[in-house]
Amino acid sequence: MKILVADKISAKGVAFLRQQPGFEVVEAYGSSPEKILSLVKDVHAIAVRSETKITREVIAAAPLLKVVGRAGVGVDNVDVEAATERGVVVMNTPSGNTIATAELTFTHMLCGARPVPQAAASMASGKWDRKSFSGVELFRKTLGIVGLGRIGGEVAKRAQAFGMRVLAYDPYLAPSRAKALQVEGVSLDELIAQADFITVHMPLTEDTHYMIDETSFEKCKKGLRIFNCARGGIIKESALLAALKSGKVAAAGLDVFEDEPLAADSEFRKLPNVVLTPHLGASTAEAQDAVGVEVAEQIADVLNGGVIRNAVNMPSIDAAAVKVLGPYLDLGSKLGALVQQIAPAQIAELRITYWGKVGELDINPITRAIQRGYLRRISGEEVNFVNAPVIFNRLGVRVEVVKSTTESAYTDLTQIEAVTPDGQVFSAAGTLIGKNNNPRIVLINGRDVDVAAEGKLLVLENVDQPGMVGTIGTILGKDKVNIADMSLSRLSAGSTAYMVVRVDSEPSETARKEIKGHAAIKVAKFVQL
């Protein structure tokens, strides 16, 4: 079997592949898209980093392709949807850069506390200046960690070794996780107000974009030191620049930026109290070796019929089972995403119940698909079918799975319930319809609905009164948003009603505010499946 190594991975990883019986390894670093297309015609696996783009066209040109392995975390350079349609496994290596990124974060923190780079530059210029580079100690200072996932947890351990008090903000942080790491779980506002140092370790999503902005810097201590080795855009760069120039923020360390590469004329380059690195989070010999060997081992496992590990588009199952389970995996992932977006941030339990035919299948992969769907928008790390249960456990969320023997109105039904610490339940259920196994949402929060499980949804709870359908249609029409599908539900006339509207495009912020502000609308959620 032929493996194309399209980007340079560690020599140890390539050597491992070459040692496997029956494997032919082709190294083609820096190839043009046209060259890649010509090379993939007879390959069974492709190994990449971030340079080579594995597009739909590339996947279509590779009829024998079984697996794409990404030596690293992000898979933005791989068309995962096209790969999934073809039954091609896409894998990443999420754990290989944890220590490297945590240590780089701490390097930035130390350089922010003691201006070593600036002092070194002064020495290199021939000076002997002992007065300009006074710093502060980490000992007994307060560190605020925004995002207590895998990397944030490692940073917390190192900070405690330096004698720091550690605060953590993570909207999905369970008290048990905070206790295990011996950190104080606080709100974001409390963290910003109390911290001497802040480091961010969140994914970049709609919710985390600019989560630290002008308002944050107004609330922070004078002399704050702040660091970002996660994703550009979590800290608003214009706000940080202003805070650095005013002296409100004493120092910053940045490894990631809103736009990369960082512009040559960026104002950050001119500030003496900023240390910049060019996205080096995973750039250690050990991390590169780790992800290179890990991706090589994972590719070999797939080609040799072994376990599928760290798949981003399917669970650890064999290819034959994927064909049967595929529609259920898709439905489960979408139901998980739906419930996450209608439920509060912190939950204590996730209950998954299967009725009918689906309960006769191997439900473990489906359960993992549901968990991944729930986590993928909110986790501070890449979520796949392997690590989703681990992340739930780390968050302190109990997952209960039940195969029900009671009767259901459907041949098969999958229901997900998110239970909050105070016992509130937020739920959705779905089934597969027709010969093509089309996924449908049939219940939301106990109300009967019927809408395709795809695309963009408005989930509305409103007073049951005349004109509501027209009102919503008018608002969306003004916003040039087309309605693709709609389902209405109520328990009785005049009670609270549910309206689920599937739309072709995302409503503007103005339209959303108008909907949420309508007197008859009790709850309005915009959901992306």
Locate predicted features:
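NAD(P)-dependent dehydrogenase/reductase Rossmann-like domain
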Residues: S283-L529
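Phosphate-binding beta-alpha-beta segment of Rossmann-like dinucleotide-binding domains, i.e.
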Residues: R86, P94-T142, V146, R150, ...
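Phosphate-coordination loops involved in phosphoryl transfer and adenosine-cofactor binding
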Residues: L65, F139-T142, E214, G223
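Rossmann-like dinucleotide-binding domain for NAD(H)/NADP(H)
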Residues: R86, V90-M91, E214, G223-I342, ...
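An N-terminal-biased, well-structured beta-alpha scaffold segment characteristic
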Residues: M1-M91, D213-T215
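Rossmann-like adenosine-cofactor binding region
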Residues: T52-I59, P171-E267
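Short beta->alpha connector loops at strand-helix junctions that form conserved
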Residues: A28-Y29, R49, A71-G72, G87-I99, ...
